[in-house]
A protein has these predicted regions:
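N-terminal small-domain helix-loop-helix segment of the aminotransferase-like
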Residues: 4-97, 104, 153, 278-281, ...
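A short helix-loop-beta submotif of the ANL/AMP-binding
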Residues: 132-138
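Active-site phosphate-binding strand-loop segment of PLP-dependent enzymes
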Residues: 142-209
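PLP-dependent enzyme catalytic core of the Aspartate aminotransferase-like
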Residues: 155, 338-347, 352-391
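Conserved core segment of the aminotransferase class I/II
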Residues: 219, 223-294, 298-307, 383-389
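Conserved PLP-binding catalytic core of the aspartate aminotransferase-like
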Residues: 293-294, 307-343
């Protein structure tokens, strides 16, 4: 490469593990239980609303912070589910996906030398985004088997330089839903250190059994210290639309909007109208989807257990965490690559969800697929790990 080097944060990044494993799955004709996207699109009525808007127009730049219909629908959603009121004119920003919402929020709050806390295992975008902004990233490392937040963990990560903590609940990849005690502990540290919380709530409605997603922003004194991120793709099985949003107090959202205008500036008006329709008319789909996913979770837990994996509890998201230590001594990545090539089932190794020294033997399976797909994956795994199966 001629000339001077590029940004060292991105120069040292490999292709994301999700792209790598999906490409490997395609190459070997494997069932892809790695990347977390449904294999069936969301409701036709939502897609028709977007198609109608595309045909009828206008198809020019919409307002930078989002069309009024969608901003109002988002504010109504948060008021209904969390009893937190936001002004749609000044406290909502629509983004091109939740990952852009994360980037905008980090850009709005972080300056060079600030400290940012992430909870590991963590979505793999957090660390490089923050480091590219000049942040010093501290990690709170949750430990199996329960992956719970504790006061000593947070005390070891927070300092007087802490500017923000990224909070993902339900937590990808382990499926934890932080309970009220854990969230109150988080809130206490955020307040004590006068920090902010960027709440990655994209799996907010995918919560199982008797667990409840509690929005951190709804806790006492947290409204002024939180930015809350949502995702239409996760709610309505429309991940390719890449429509997300940020809600929060006006002073913080104004900074998010300033960052957003220099990133994507805006998002397709037709897709925004489709999502506005969905939030106002199709939330029953989202709630019924969660019931379907719970049945699929239970099916895959049984299938993985029969194949010889240890399986951790899953309280939310559409991912299962499996322990392969009784099946192999290989690294998680080598094992996942072999599983894809030889068993015909792709999964995601856990190590990319940690900055360094992730736990050995853990892998992530997505169960947001059709039952026929999950059944075939179960058959392949059971056959491959059968004691009489050839190796």
């Amino acid at each position: 490469m001629g000339g001077r080097e590029g940004n060292p944060v991105f120069a040292r990044q490999d292709t994301t593990i999700f792209t790598v494993m999906s490409s490997l799955a395609t190459k070997h004709g494997a069932i892809n239980l790695g990347q977390g996207y449904p294999d069936k699109d969301g409701p036709l009525a939502i897609r028709e609303a977007a198609a109608r808007a595309l045909r009828e127009g206008p198809n020019q730049y919409p307002p930078m912070t989002g069309i009024p219909e969608l901003r109002t629908a988002i504010a109504n959603h948060d008021a209904h589910f969390y009893r937190v009121e936001f002004d749609p004119k000044s406290e909502v920003v629509v983004t091109s996906g939740a990952t852009e919402a994360l980037a905008d929020s980090f850009m709005a709050l972080i300056g060079p030398g600030d400290e940012a806390v992430i909870i590991e295992p963590a979505y793999d975008s957090y660390r490089p985004m923050l480091e590219a902004l000049g942040a010093c990233v501290k990690s709170v490392r949750l430990e199996p088997p329960d992956f719970r937040l504790t006061e000593p963990m947070l005390a070891g990560a927070f300092s007087n330089k802490t500017k923000l903590i990224a909070v993902n609940s339900p937590l990808n990849p382990v499926g934890r839903v932080f309970d009220r005690n854990e969230l109150e502990l988080l809130a206490a540290f955020v307040s004590r250190y006068r920090a902010y919380a960027v709440c990655d709530d994209v799996y907010e409605h995918i919560v199982f059994d008797d667990y409840e997603h509690i929005a951190l922003i709804s806790l006492p004194n947290m409204r002024e210290r939180c930015l809350r991120i949502g995702s239409a793709g996760k709610m309505f099985s429309l991940t390719g639309w890449k429509v997300g949003w940020v809600t929060g107090p006006e002073p913080l959202v104004r900074l998010v909007a300033n960052a957003h205008q220099f990133n994507t500036f805006t998002t397709s008006p037709a897709l925004q109208l489709g999502v506005a329709y969905a939030l106002e008319n199709e939330m029953n789909f989202t709630l019924s989807l969660t019931r379907e996913l719970q049945a699929k979770r239970d099916f895959l837990i049984e299938a993985l257990t029969r194949a010889g994996f240890g399986v951790f509890p899953c309280e939310g998201t559409y991912f299962l965490t499996a322990d392969s230590s009784k099946l192999t001594e290989e690294s998680d990545r080598i094992f996942c690559e072999r599983l894809t090539r030889e068993a015909g089932v792709a999964a995601i190794p856990f190590s990319p969800f940690y900055g360094q020294d992730g736990p050995s033997g853990l892998i992530r399976f997505a169960f947001c697929k059709g039952m026929d797909v999950l059944n075939e994956a179960a058959n392949r795994l059971e056959k491959y790990f059968s004691p009489v199966a050839p190796r």
